[in-house]
Design a protein with these regions (language model features):
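Short, surface-exposed basic-aromatic patches at helix termini and helix-loop junctions that form
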Residues: 199-206, 236-237
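Short alpha-helix in the alpha/beta-hydrolase fold that links the catalytic acid
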Residues: 42-43, 193-202
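A catalytic-pocket lid/entrance helix-loop region that shapes and gates access to the active site
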Residues: 1-5
Length: 246
């Protein structure tokens, strides 16, 4: 982090590896249990020599390929917009960045510039999670291509998004018993807050009639890792052939 704060690195794609871009590696941690080992492996071989003065080419290529926003800019443009639920939650206005900046206005564990300057391991530098930032148009070459910066900012300021959910309607549809619903909730999912899931599916929530499969056997990548098993479980719960406490 100290090296990148003082000397951002040019990447083979033409983008720039800054300290803030490096912290976006945190996004991969919830993708699969094996990603923790992969991240540890690449970080242990990041420098060419023990003096931590020069990055290996393999590390720089890894950083280029592990964060695929250049190949998938629509993910960057619409990541926050998919949560814009009508005029109640519009515009998105770079909400993750706004929340981060609010956190670091005073000394905070979230301030990577502060924690990276400390010698003590008691205040480790924290990775970012599944979020996007306006500065990505500067660090990722394709995200800041012709017209892309203006497009990203215009989407962040868009105020006329339609409604995503009708909580009352969902509650009514599930309440009459003709429509059945089942859902998986991963206890250790770093992308989806467990308590919010319990609020939505609990008593009084719009999905209170949903049968809930709560497990810590999987992370966010459950469908990718064991999709057929999870689908069979949920289908059985919804159809009544598999009984669960919920």
């Amino acid at each position: 982090m100290q090296k990148l704060l003082s000397e951002p690195q040019s990447l083979p794609s033409g983008g720039t590896l800054t300290a803030r871009r490096f912290l976006q590696l945190g996004m991969m941690m919830g993708g699969s249990p094996s990603n923790f080992a992969s991240l540890h492996s690449i970080l242990s071989t990041a420098f060419l020599h023990d003096d931590e003065n020069e990055f290996t080419r393999a590390f720089l290529k890894y950083m280029d390929n592990s964060e695929p926003f250049d190949e998938h800019p629509i993910y960057f443009w619409l990541h926050e917009s998919i949560y814009a639920d009508g005029d109640r939650f519009s515009p998105t206005n770079w909400s993750a960045n706004e929340a981060y900046e609010a956190k670091v206005r005073t000394p905070s564990e979230y301030d990577y510039k502060l924690t990276s300057s400390l010698a003590s391991d008691d205040r480790p530098t924290l990775f970012f999670g599944e979020m996007v930032f306006p500065w990505m148009t500067e660090d990722y070459v394709e995200c800041g291509g012709l017209g892309c910066t203006a497009l990203a900012n215009n989407l962040a300021q868009k105020v006329d998004w339609g409604r995503l959910y009708d909580a009352d309607h969902m509650k009514t549809v599930l309440g009459d018993g003709r429509t059945r619903s089942a859902a998986a909730v991963y206890y250790d999912d770093i992308y989806v807050d467990f308590d919010i899931c319990m609020e939505v599916t609990g008593p009084g929530g719009p999905l209170e009639k949903t049968k809930v499969y709560i497990t810590n056997d999987y992370q966010h990548s459950g469908l990718r890792d064991s999709g057929s098993q999870i689908f069979s479980k949920l289908h059985g719960m919804a159809s009544g052939s598999v009984r669960t406490p919920s």
